[in-house]
Amino acid sequence: YRLLGHEVEPQVLRVNLPPRFSAPGLPELNHSQFTAVKAVLQRPLSLIQGPPGTGKTVTSATLVYHLARQGMGQVLVCAPSNVAVDHLTAKISATGLRVVRLCAKSREAVSTDVDHLSLHCMVRALNTPEKQDLRKLQLLKDELGELVSVDEKRFRRLRSSAEREILQAADVICTTCVGAGDPRLSNVNLRFRQA
């Protein structure tokens, strides 16, 4: 086949295929989905296409589950729309993996079904003694609308540190294709071996 105008030699990766291809928390795979998952796990690049309602989201979530379970680092999941990313986030989360949904700062005010998995909501929900300063500053910022310069700098530093912790602990990070360029991903020592 050809990729970007160049002839590409077919490659088969040597991987330990799972004994069972369906993922926990997701529907059993049909024959086409099973074939797709098995093929994708053995190739460096794959394309899955099909009409709406044919199980591409379940197939993708199953693939992500198996890629994450191989222990080769975090998996970055991208889709072109926020709705697609939210659907994938929900399905992947159902498998029991630690999933974080990264959305643009401009979308943080938009409520979704996966808010509890969104980075900004996870940061707000932190309630450990070490995070009390961040929580107090967040409440103050919510109440006043803005912080004085010194408090704003401290707030940003603490929030950035909390975001880094959450992102580094995730098995899977889901975002839009544009969101994959978010500075919060580049400022963190992430271990993406698969996207």
What are these regions (language model features)?
Residues 1-22, 65, 71-78, 83-192:
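Conserved P-loop NTPase motor core of helicases/translocases
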Residues 25-44, 59, 175:
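N-terminal pre-P-loop "Q-motif" helix
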Residues 41, 68-69:
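Residue-level signal for alpha-helix termini/capping positions
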Residues 46-47, 76:
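Short hydrophobic/aromatic beta-strand immediately N-terminal to the Walker A/P-loop
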Residues 50:
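The Walker A (P-loop) glycine that initiates the GxxxxGKT/S ATP-binding motif of P-loop NTPases
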Residues 53:
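Walker A (P-loop) phosphate-binding loop of P-loop NTPases
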Residues 57-65:
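Motif I (Walker A/P-loop) of helicase-class P-loop NTPases
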